[in-house]
Amino acid sequence: MRLANPLTLPPLTLAYLGDALYEAFVRERLLERGYVRVNDLHRHALRYVQATAQAAILHHLMPALTEQEQDVVRRGRNAKGHGAPKSADPAEYAASTGFEALVGYLYLAGQAERLSEVLQAAADFIERGQ
Protein backbone atom coordinates (compact mmCIF):
# COMPACT_ATOMS: atom_id res chain seq x y z
CA MET A 1 0.00 0.00 0.00
CA ARG A 2 1.12 3.55 -0.52
CA LEU A 3 -0.22 6.54 1.39
CA ALA A 4 0.63 10.05 0.20
CA ASN A 5 2.34 10.99 3.46
CA PRO A 6 2.19 8.45 6.27
CA LEU A 7 4.11 10.88 8.49
CA THR A 8 0.88 12.85 8.89
CA LEU A 9 -0.71 9.93 10.74
CA PRO A 10 -0.53 9.71 14.53
CA PRO A 11 2.35 7.47 15.60
CA LEU A 12 0.04 5.14 17.49
CA THR A 13 -1.92 4.60 14.26
CA LEU A 14 1.31 3.60 12.53
CA ALA A 15 2.10 1.29 15.46
CA TYR A 16 -1.39 -0.24 15.35
CA LEU A 17 -0.89 -1.23 11.73
CA GLY A 18 2.74 -2.21 12.30
CA ASP A 19 1.74 -4.56 15.11
CA ALA A 20 -0.64 -6.43 12.80
CA LEU A 21 1.87 -6.56 9.95
CA TYR A 22 4.69 -7.83 12.16
CA GLU A 23 2.43 -10.45 13.75
CA ALA A 24 1.37 -11.70 10.29
CA PHE A 25 5.03 -11.80 9.17
CA VAL A 26 6.01 -13.84 12.23
CA ARG A 27 3.12 -16.27 11.82
CA GLU A 28 3.93 -16.83 8.15
CA ARG A 29 7.60 -17.36 8.98
CA LEU A 30 6.74 -19.96 11.60
CA LEU A 31 4.45 -21.78 9.18
CA GLU A 32 7.28 -21.83 6.63
CA ARG A 33 9.47 -23.46 9.28
CA GLY A 34 6.98 -26.27 9.77
CA TYR A 35 5.04 -25.19 12.83
CA VAL A 36 1.40 -26.05 12.18
CA ARG A 37 -0.15 -26.72 15.58
CA VAL A 38 -1.77 -23.60 16.98
CA ASN A 39 -0.25 -24.04 20.44
CA ASP A 40 3.24 -24.36 18.94
CA LEU A 41 2.67 -21.35 16.69
CA HIS A 42 1.53 -19.24 19.61
CA ARG A 43 4.38 -20.32 21.89
CA HIS A 44 7.05 -19.65 19.27
CA ALA A 45 5.47 -16.39 18.09
CA LEU A 46 5.77 -14.96 21.60
CA ARG A 47 9.57 -15.02 21.26
CA TYR A 48 9.27 -12.52 18.41
CA VAL A 49 6.37 -10.31 19.44
CA GLN A 50 6.78 -9.67 23.17
CA ALA A 51 7.65 -6.09 24.07
CA THR A 52 11.00 -7.26 25.46
CA ALA A 53 11.92 -8.89 22.14
CA GLN A 54 10.78 -5.93 20.06
CA ALA A 55 12.72 -3.51 22.27
CA ALA A 56 15.86 -5.63 21.81
CA ILE A 57 15.25 -5.76 18.05
CA LEU A 58 14.92 -1.99 17.91
CA HIS A 59 18.10 -1.45 19.91
CA HIS A 60 19.91 -3.77 17.48
CA LEU A 61 18.48 -2.07 14.37
CA MET A 62 18.80 1.61 15.37
CA PRO A 63 22.33 2.15 13.99
CA ALA A 64 21.21 0.84 10.57
CA LEU A 65 18.09 3.02 10.35
CA THR A 66 17.95 6.19 8.30
CA GLU A 67 17.42 9.51 10.02
CA GLN A 68 13.79 9.57 8.89
CA GLU A 69 13.22 6.02 10.14
CA GLN A 70 14.76 6.97 13.49
CA ASP A 71 12.39 9.95 13.67
CA VAL A 72 9.42 7.63 13.11
CA VAL A 73 10.72 5.36 15.88
CA ARG A 74 11.12 8.32 18.25
CA ARG A 75 7.59 9.51 17.51
CA GLY A 76 6.23 6.04 18.24
CA ARG A 77 8.34 5.59 21.35
CA ASN A 78 7.34 8.99 22.76
CA ALA A 79 3.64 8.81 21.85
CA LYS A 80 1.25 9.41 24.70
CA GLY A 81 -1.63 7.09 25.40
CA HIS A 82 0.03 3.72 24.92
CA GLY A 83 0.21 2.77 28.57
CA ALA A 84 2.16 -0.42 29.12
CA PRO A 85 0.39 -3.45 30.54
CA LYS A 86 1.26 -4.16 34.17
CA SER A 87 3.38 -7.11 33.09
CA ALA A 88 5.56 -5.01 30.74
CA ASP A 89 8.42 -2.65 31.47
CA PRO A 90 7.27 0.84 30.36
CA ALA A 91 10.55 1.61 28.55
CA GLU A 92 10.47 -1.70 26.68
CA TYR A 93 6.82 -1.21 25.79
CA ALA A 94 7.55 2.28 24.47
CA ALA A 95 10.45 0.93 22.40
CA SER A 96 8.28 -1.84 21.00
CA THR A 97 5.71 0.79 20.01
CA GLY A 98 8.49 2.62 18.18
CA PHE A 99 9.41 -0.56 16.30
CA GLU A 100 5.78 -1.18 15.36
CA ALA A 101 5.41 2.44 14.19
CA LEU A 102 8.42 1.94 11.92
CA VAL A 103 6.88 -1.19 10.40
CA GLY A 104 3.57 0.60 9.81
CA TYR A 105 5.33 3.61 8.31
CA LEU A 106 7.43 1.57 5.88
CA TYR A 107 4.34 -0.30 4.72
CA LEU A 108 2.23 2.82 4.19
CA ALA A 109 5.13 4.62 2.50
CA GLY A 110 5.27 1.84 -0.07
CA GLN A 111 8.82 0.90 0.92
CA ALA A 112 8.26 -2.84 0.50
CA GLU A 113 11.93 -3.71 -0.01
CA ARG A 114 13.04 -1.79 3.08
CA LEU A 115 10.17 -3.25 5.10
CA SER A 116 11.28 -6.73 4.07
CA GLU A 117 14.87 -5.93 5.11
CA VAL A 118 13.76 -4.70 8.54
CA LEU A 119 11.45 -7.66 9.17
CA GLN A 120 14.09 -10.14 8.03
CA ALA A 121 16.72 -8.52 10.25
CA ALA A 122 14.31 -8.58 13.20
CA ALA A 123 13.51 -12.27 12.78
CA ASP A 124 17.16 -13.20 12.23
CA PHE A 125 18.09 -11.34 15.42
CA ILE A 126 15.52 -13.26 17.47
CA GLU A 127 16.47 -16.58 15.91
CA ARG A 128 20.14 -16.03 16.75
CA GLY A 129 19.09 -15.79 20.38
CA GLN A 130 19.48 -12.03 20.71
UniProtKB/Swiss-Prot annotation:
Gene Ontology annotations of biological process type: rRNA processing
An MF annotation (GO) of this entry: rRNA binding
Active site positions: D19
Main location: cytoplasm
GO CC term, one of those recorded: cytoplasm
Sorted UniProt keywords: Cytoplasm, Endonuclease, Hydrolase, Magnesium, Nuclease, Ribosome biogenesis, RNA-binding, rRNA processing, rRNA-binding
Region (Disordered): 69-91
Subcellular location: Cytoplasm
Cofactor(s) needed by this chain: Mg(2+)
SUPFAM superfamilies xref list: RNase III domain-like
Pfam families: Ribonuclease_3
Enzyme Commission code: 3.1.26.-
Subunit description: Homodimer.
Family to which the UniProt record says this protein belongs: Belongs to the MrnC RNase family.
HAMAP family assigned: RNase_Mini_III (MF_01468)
Function: Involved in correct processing of both the 5' and 3' ends of 23S rRNA precursor. Processes 30S rRNA precursor transcript even in absence of ribonuclease 3 (Rnc); Rnc processes 30S rRNA into smaller rRNA precursors.
Protein name as catalogued: Mini-ribonuclease 3
Phylogenetic placement of the source organism: Bacteria, Bacillati, Bacillota, Clostridia, Eubacteriales
Gene name per UniProt: mrnC
